[in-house]
Amino acid sequence: MLKITIITLGNKMPDWVNSGVNEYAKRFHDGIQIKLIEIPLLRRNKSSDLARILEKESALTKDALPANARLIALDMLGKSFSSEELALRLTQLQQISSHLCFIIGGPEGLSNEILTLCDERWSLSKLTLPHPLVRIILLESLYRAWSIINNHPYHK
């Protein structure tokens, strides 16, 4: 069984986000287990020391990392994939690890410490995406790749 953990920094999401996440998570059948770990954002204001906040959020993220998982940072500068390329990459990764962990940063992104810990960096888009949508786009992209791998009609 493939385990997918998504660690995300963010505050309580609106119902439509949770509905989207739940919809894609339940579409994966018995072969894939999805787990979402939400780390609350630290308070920010105009006088906040963003470097210090990033350092603290980095420590919280590090504490949440599952042991023996392949760590994949979502980062604008990461590698981007077509749906078919992503399906191929997932097939390759399943032979390397049975646990993939995707990390979604906060408004300032991920710290260099977290990026260095990661085995890979992927980009969903060159656009800056709102954090609520990133969760849904990631799960939809993974589901689409899964449907390609399994010849499921969803992709076409």
UniProtKB/Swiss-Prot annotation:
Compartments reported by the entry: Cytoplasm
Positions bound to S-adenosyl-L-methionine: 74, 105, 124-129
A GO cellular-component term linked to this record: cytoplasm
Catalytic function, reaction form: pseudouridine(1915) in 23S rRNA + S-adenosyl-L-methionine = N(3)-methylpseudouridine(1915) in 23S rRNA + S-adenosyl-L-homocysteine + H(+)
A Pfam family assignment: SPOUT_MTase
Superkingdom, taxonomy of origin: Bacteria
Enzyme Commission (EC) number: 2.1.1.177
N-terminal signal peptide: none
Membrane-traversing stretches: none
InterPro entries xrefs: Alpha/beta_knot_MTases, RlmH-like, tRNA_m1G_MTases_N
Any one GO molecular function term: rRNA (pseudouridine-N3-)-methyltransferase activity
Coiled-coil spans in chain: none
Principal EC category: transferase
Keywords linked to the UniProt accession: Cytoplasm, Methyltransferase, rRNA processing, S-adenosyl-L-methionine, Transferase
Task performed by this protein: Specifically methylates the pseudouridine at position 1915 (m3Psi1915) in 23S rRNA.
Entry's family note: Belongs to the RNA methyltransferase RlmH family.
Subunit structure: Homodimer.
Protein name: Ribosomal RNA large subunit methyltransferase H
Species per Swiss-Prot/TrEMBL record: Legionella pneumophila subsp. pneumophila (strain Philadelphia 1 / ATCC 33152 / DSM 7513)
Classification of source organism: Bacteria, Pseudomonadati, Pseudomonadota, Gammaproteobacteria, Legionellales
Chain's gene name: rlmH
